[in-house]
């Protein structure tokens, strides 16, 4: 994957040496990162009303230590589950041997993956890039849905009526008969629907509405 320029990797670990090593590794792969020394600090960052480093419209992933003083990595993970952020912000747990079963259970509950310390640099970077790809794909789907909803909201009631019948495959003459309007009026509404929905054919319109 070629990471997006605005992608950001978050590092949450209480060990300064681990944070510095990971930040250096990511810099060497041209992956921007932001480090936090505790889960509490990262939770406060997420809850801040104004943040300049990241927003949910930006691809990202989280490298999260399992055991830390104060809030544990698992407790922070629970918050991300509650806020439905795991697809936008995939979590890769960093774990010692003793915590592997816990990390495996977290993966079953939605974490992207876990890496056991000491980890292979290349293997970790590969998983980070895959996590960023998931994040970017999720955001792309979300934006497409938002665009679709806005386009639908821009349609008039009559345009929605025409669109429904167009998608059902009815020709203009039958649409005109069903709606008790002229064929010319159907053609005008049909053209406006295509323009507002940014499609060029009835098939493309149907696929768009089905999310294909």
Residue ranges and their predicted role:
Residues 68:
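Receiver (REC) domain active-site loop signature in two-component systems and cognate sites
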Residues 64-65, 95:
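Active-site residues of response regulator receiver
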Residues 191-212:
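Basic, Lys/Arg-enriched C-terminal extension of HTH/homeodomain DNA-binding domains
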Residues 35-61:
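Acidic, metal-coordinating helix/loop segments flanking the phosphotransfer/catalytic sites
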Residues 101, 115-128:
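C-terminal output helix
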Residues 74-87, 105:
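Short amphipathic alpha-helix used as the core "switch/output" element in two-component signaling
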Residues 37-38, 72-78, 201:
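Acidic catalytic/metal-coordinating carboxylates
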């Amino acid at each position: 994957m070629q990471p997006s320029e605005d992608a950001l990797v978050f590092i949450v670990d209480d060990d300064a040496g681990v944070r510095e090593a990971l930040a250096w590794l990511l810099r060497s792969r041209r992956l921007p990162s932001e480090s936090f020394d505790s889960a509490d600090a990262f939770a406060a960052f997420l809850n801040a009303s104004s943040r300049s480093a990241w927003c949910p419209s930006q691809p990202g992933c989280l490298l999260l230590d399992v055991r830390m003083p104060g809030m544990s990595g698992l407790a922070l993970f629970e918050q991300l589950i509650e806020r439905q952020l795991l697809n936008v912000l995939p979590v890769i747990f960093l774990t010692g041997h003793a915590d592997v079963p816990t990390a495996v259970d977290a993966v079953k509950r939605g974490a992207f993956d876990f890496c056991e310390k000491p980890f292979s640099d290349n293997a970790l970077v590969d998983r980070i890039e895959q996590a960023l790809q998931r994040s970017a794909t999720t955001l792309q789907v979300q934006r497409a849905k938002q665009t679709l909803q806005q386009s639908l909201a821009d349609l008039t009631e009559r345009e929605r009526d025409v669109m429904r019948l167009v998608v059902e495959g009815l020709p203009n003459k039958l649409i005109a008969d069903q709606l008790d309007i002229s064929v010319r009026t159907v053609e005008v509404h049909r053209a406006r629907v295509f323009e507002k929905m940014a499609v060029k054919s009835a098939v493309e319109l149907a696929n768009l509405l089905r999310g294909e």
